[in-house]
Structures are given as C-alpha cells and as structure tokens.
Amino acid sequence: MNDHQKNHATSQDDNTKSTPSKNSKHIKIKLWHFILVILGIILLTSIITVVSTILISHQKSGLNKEQRANLKKIEYVYQTLNKDYYKKQSSDKLTQSAIDGMVKELKDPYSEYMTAEETKQFNEGVSGDFVGIGAEMQKKNEQISVTSPMKDSPAEKAGIQPKDIVTQVNHHSVVGKPLDQVVKMVRGKKGTYVTLTIKRGSQEKDIKIKRDTIHVKSVEYEKKGNVGVLTINKFQSNTSGELKSAIIKAHKQGIRHIILDLRNNPGGLLDEAVKMANIFIDKGNTVVQLEKGKDKEELKTSNQALKQAKDMKVSILVNEGSASASEVFTGAMKDYHKAKVYGSKTFGKGIVQTIREFSDGSLIKYTEMKWLTPDGHYIHGKGIRPDVSISTPKYQSLNVIPDNKTYHQGEKDKNVKTMKIGLKALGYPIDNETNIFDEQLESAIKTFQQDNNLKVNGNFDKKTNDKFTEKLVEKANKKDTVLNDLLNKLK
C-alpha cells in the first residue's frame, strides 16, 4: 500500500482538423494575437486544473479546515528543523519521532508504529514463516546450544543435532552474545549459506547450511490415552487448517474427546479465529460482533462444521495469558455450548487492531473497533471465566525478575516475594512470602548457588537470577500440573 494516492487531471486535445475554405485568405488574425489567446487558454486551464485538484485532494483526504491547518503546522516544523536547525538532522528520524508522538498520545498499548525491520519481524510472526535454518536454540550456562532441529529443516538435513553447542557463526565467535543477536546472525536471505561451528562432545566442526523458508506450526497434537491434546500457540495464517488436519488425524486414531489448549496464546489473526470456530459451528452462525460507534458488523461461519469434529467432545483450557483471538474463539464456543471451558480467567482483550502498511515497508497498527461474543458479552478488562476452575501453581505465574539489579539481605522489594515463591517451588526451605529479604531467604539463596555451581554469597545477582529462571522453566515444562488435573477430571 502506498503512503498516499495522487490525483491526476487528464486532458485530451481535439485532434479534428478543419480544412481551410477558399475565403480563408480574407481572415486576418495576427500571429502574436493568436499566441496570446492560446497562452490564455492554457493558463486558464492550468488554474482550473490546479484548483480542481486541490479541492478533490482536500475532499478525498477527509480533513476539515482545522485539521488541514494542523497538518500544515506539522509540515512547517518538519521543514524548518530539517533545513534550518544548526545540526544536520535525519529526515527519517524526524518523521518517525512525529509519528511515535501521535501514537503515544493515544495511550493505547495495542497501537504502534513499526519500522520496516520491525514490520518484517511482525509479518513473520503473523504468517509463521521466516527464512533461516530451522534450528531451535537456547542460551544455557553462557553457551548457545541447539534444543532441536525442526523436522525436514535445512538444519536437520545438514546434520545438526540436539545439544550441539554453537561456538561460531560464519567464523565469528558467539561466546557471550545475546541469543537474539545470534539468531539474527544465523538468519538471512533465502538460498544463501551460513556456516555454524558446532561443538559435539570433544569434537568441533564446521557445518555449511543453505537457508530456506521455514514454517513454524501453530498447532501441536499429542495423544494422551483416549484424549487428544491440541496445543494452539497463536492464531497465524492457516492455524485453522492445521487444527482441522490434527482433528482428522485424532479421529482416525479413535479419539472422541479433545482438549484445545489455548493457555498463553496471545491471539493473532481474527479471521483465523472465525475459521477455527467454523470447524465446530455450522454455517450461517455469528462468531463475533464488531462495533465502531454506530456501525456494527457480524462475522459469520461460511461452511458446515467438520464432520469429524461433530463426533467429539471438546474441552478448552485457558489462563490469564489467553487473549484476543483466543477469547473470540473461546467466547463463541462457550455461547453455542460447543465446549466446556477449564482453567483460569482469560486476559480480557475485547478490541480489534487494524494494520496499514506504507510503501517503505513500515506500518501503523491501531485500535479500530471493539468486539462482542455472539450473545453480546463485552469481555474487555473482564476476561472469560471458565466453567470449571483449575488453579495454576504460583510459581508458573511469576513475573521475570529484572536482571539489572543485585538484591541483598535487608531490602524490601516486590521481587523478593517472587524469589521466595520460586525457591519454595524448587524445594528450598521458605516459610513466608513477604517482600522482605530476610536471613532465611539469604540462606536459601546460598544453598541454591552451591547446588548450581555459582559463586556463594547469598546475594540475588544476575547469574543467580538467570539460573533461577532456567530452573523454574524446566520445572514447569517437566510437569504440567494443570493439564494433568484436567486429564484426571475427564477420566
């Protein structure tokens, strides 16, 4: 989409020729007079064209007189600073700052302006596609290691294995570099090559890998006894197609009860939420109502429900991280009594964002309307309450402690409570959850540091924080208490 459209006024010359009559020699028009007439016509036509173009432009812009004056003021300030400021300014930065200022004034966390690079990353997240090698990586013990290569990915075909330690990318050391920086080094243009120097056991070798388009699936299926668990990570392009395929596969395996796990699913594409609901809800039914002032629109299902889905009982698992499109889908399934909802109250995001892309690759994302469930429930700031509550262990809901500060005994801070809850979950003796850094916490930290080969000083420093977070994530991934509780309820 271009930044704006130009209106062009097109004129067509009259090419009809008139044949001179025999009396034409008696018609005496001085050449200079003829030229003046023609110039007058051209000038008049030009003035009319310019005025018409300006009027049309103003009408099509949708701006009133006051708004046009404000826009002119912004343009004047931009030109003045660009031309007359005593230090040379970047035109791009001035433009971005002006846009950022307007968006910030909205005080809306969901509206934002993105640069071309940020837009690229955003689109990758929406589509699920990116160019790379298809290797999941993590930073552990100050080393970059491969968690696992994706199936049929360039990394897998090249021989990359789980637990490989990456020491160099294109012969540049990655030791001490942040994980996101290493990932950027690995990614690049499709068809180009990247060389990873990997350490496997005591051996170190270079592996050359050709970059390709990688698709990250948004739906994962796992059979748990006689129940199928379908984890839906986000609503991206073709999430509904992936879900449909997973349901058909589960049905062939004899599964007649599925769990749709939407925990920590932040949402995504609204149309995918509607298509997903259509898997379970027949044609012609409203999935979501959209409202913008007095304007209202209903998004309905366009096909009959999937035959295999009609044979199945459906349970939906949500938590406070289930938001936006996750809530659209859950709300529709709940209103039509197509599923029983378990877990904890959802996030509560009942507004919809629209995207406008510019010709330079940047975009603006802004809130345009609110949405309601088929029965008219507005969940913004309220969330959707489950039919059956399953509480999440405290340690799984903890906020990450900022690593730019070291905490000592005697301090009073909200993050101290997080340390206590986390260490208690990891098996260390803590008998209170106050926000005061006491002797008991210091003793527990010393034991934790000793158990994990860290410097033993009783202070909660960056390295202790990193290991603390790592251990809690490992514990959460190892035993999903909420899912296990639901599976037990369904027996």
Swiss-Prot record:
GO molecular-function terms, A-Z: endopeptidase activity; serine-type peptidase activity
Region entry Disordered, spans: 1-22
GO cellular component, one term: plasma membrane
Active site (catalytic residues): 324, 335, 349
EC category: hydrolase
Biased composition (Polar residues): 8-22
PDZ domain: residues covered: 119-201
Keywords: Cell membrane, Hydrolase, Membrane, Protease, Serine protease, Transmembrane, Transmembrane helix
Membrane topology summary: Single-pass membrane protein
Main location: membrane
Gene3D superfamilies associated with the record: 2-enoyl-CoA Hydratase, Chain A, domain 1 (3.90.226.10), 2.30.42.10, 3.30.750.44, PGBD-like superfamily/PGBD (1.10.101.10)
Compartment(s) where it occurs, according to its Swiss-Prot or TrEMBL record: Cell membrane
TM helices/strands, residue ranges: 31-51
GO biological process annotation, one example: proteolysis
Annotated EC: 3.4.21.-
Protein family per UniProt: Belongs to the peptidase S41A family.
Name recorded for this polypeptide: Probable CtpA-like serine protease
Organism name: Staphylococcus epidermidis (strain ATCC 35984 / DSM 28319 / BCRC 17069 / CCUG 31568 / BM 3577 / RP62A)
